[in-house]
Amino acid sequence: MLPSISFDYIKRPNIVLFSNVLSLSSNI
């Protein structure tokens, strides 16, 4: 993975990541 993407991810709020994980869990 490119460091740019990683940096962008870290910059974004963790809430978005949490929401994504929850959505994935719900999908399963």
Swiss-Prot record:
It comes from Saccharomyces cerevisiae (strain ATCC 204508 / S288c) (Baker's yeast). This is Uncharacterized protein YGL007C-A.
